[in-house]
Amino acid sequence: MNGTEGPNFYVPFSNATGVVRSPFEYPQYYLAEPWQFSMLAAYMFLLIVLGFPINFLTLYVTVQHKKLRTPLNYILLNLAVADLFMVLGGFTSTLYTSLHGYFVFGPTGCNLEGFFATLGGEIALWSLVVLAIERYVVVCKPMSNFRFGENHAIMGVAFTWVMALACAAPPLAGWSRYIPEGLQCSCGIDYYTLKPEVNNESFVIYMFVVHFTIPMIIIFFCYGQLVFTVKEAAAQQQESATTQKAEKEVTRMVIIMVIAFLICWVPYASVAFYIFTHQGSNFGPIFMTIPAFFAKSAAIYNPVIYIMMNKQFRNCMLTTICCGKNPLGDDEASATVSKTETSQVAPA
């Protein structure tokens, strides 16, 4: 074996020389240089400094401006809540542990950190699934009389939490487990061992099928149909120019969110899948650390995309920050905001 397995950890380093120690008790400087741990800490600090204000501001601005409380925005706000879970429940602890060179909070802290990181990532993924379905129903109109309303949005939010908990909670109940990963300063689901005592193999298969592959299939199907429908409608001029423009802008925003999600999470999922299907193979701690920490940047891109591509939200945010006056001169009362007929989201 090219790694060292303990009762509640797996260190990707052979203990042939006897240097491996528990990542809950000793610094892991035999895995990497101390400066590399410091770089990880600096990166986590950057994500906290950027991630908390922008996600909190997204929630605060929506509470302050009633016009932003539209059904589709409920799902987008759900993304902000998920990102805050990741920032507060995961990033802060990882910053602290990186500074110490090992996971100082012990197995219980590892469970909590892994739970919040998994929960936030899964809420984001299933929120994108709900957004894809909403775009498909609104634009492709498989149900001609359907209107995406507040009740549908609330059910969509509830669905994302149920599915996220169905992925994040089982390791706390004994189906699989959370262990330190990479440089042993952050925790995630155990992809490294089969661990029959906790039926780890069945859980990892379940997670990859139900909580990654199926959502991706739904998302790609919905947007494949959507692109075809938008092109067909444009060719036949079935909708008014204003409605077409608004629907295209909202669709473009959501598609960019999906692409950003894939850029952040597919490398992590791919490496995790490789590790799981190549048990005992030779790989270093950096092999998993880089995609794991890169995936954490997902906490800042959704609100950035939303702010950049949604003029109505951008104006409301500037008005809130600048104490009631928009410095760009777009007065809220007089600004013309095009809303789609069904989803009521302003185009950029």
Curated annotation (Swiss-Prot):
It is a multi-pass membrane protein. The modification N6-(retinylidene)lysine is found at residue 296. Changing residue 347 to L: In RP4; common variant. It comes from the Eukaryota. Zn(2+) binds at residues 201, 279. InterPro entries: GPCR_opsins, GPCR_Rhodpsn, GPCR_Rhodpsn_7TM, Opsin, Retinal_BS, Rhodopsin, Rhodopsin_N. Residues 330-348 are annotated as: Interaction with SAG. Keywords: Acetylation, Cell projection, Chromophore, Congenital stationary night blindness, Disease variant, Disulfide bond, G-protein coupled receptor, Glycoprotein, Lipoprotein, Membrane, Metal-binding, Palmitate, Phosphoprotein, Photoreceptor protein, Receptor, Retinal protein, Retinitis pigmentosa, Sensory transduction, Transducer, Transmembrane, Transmembrane helix, Vision, Zinc. The modification Phosphothreonine is found at residues 336, 340, 342. One of its GO terms (cellular component) is photoreceptor outer segment membrane. The record marks 113 as: Plays an important role in the conformation switch to the active conformation. A motif ('Ionic lock' involved in activated form stabilization) lies at residues 134-136. Homodimer. May form a complex composed of RHO, GRK1 and RCVRN in a Ca(2+)-dependent manner; RCVRN prevents the interaction between GRK1 and RHO. Interacts with GRK1. Interacts (phosphorylated form) with SAG. Interacts with GNAT1. Interacts with GNAT3. SAG and G-proteins compete for a common binding site. Interacts with PRCD; the interaction promotes PRCD stability. Forms a complex with ASAP1 and ARF4. Forms a complex with ASAP1, RAB11A, Rabin8/RAB3IP, ARF4 and RAB11FIP3; the complex regulates Golgi-to-cilia rhodopsin/RHO transport in photoreceptors. Changing residue 90 to D: In CSNBAD1; constitutive activity in the absence of bound retinal. Belongs to the G-protein coupled receptor 1 family. Opsin subfamily. This is Rhodopsin. Residues 62-73, 134-152, 225-252, 310-348 are cytoplasmic. It is linked to Retinitis pigmentosa 4: A retinal dystrophy belonging to the group of pigmentary retinopathies. Retinitis pigmentosa is characterized by retinal pigment deposits visible on fundus examination and primary loss of rod photoreceptor cells followed by secondary loss of cone photoreceptors. Patients typically have night vision blindness and loss of midperipheral visual field. As their condition progresses, they lose their far peripheral visual field and eventually central vision as well. Night blindness, congenital stationary, autosomal dominant 1: A non-progressive retinal disorder characterized by impaired night vision, often associated with nystagmus and myopia. One of its GO terms (biological process) is cellular response to light stimulus. GO terms for molecular function: 11-cis retinal binding; G protein-coupled photoreceptor activity; G protein-coupled receptor activity; metal ion binding. The modification N-acetylmethionine is found at residue 1. It is found in: Membrane; Cell projection, Cilium, Photoreceptor outer segment. The modification Phosphoserine is found at residues 334, 338, 343. Glycans are attached at residues 2, 15.
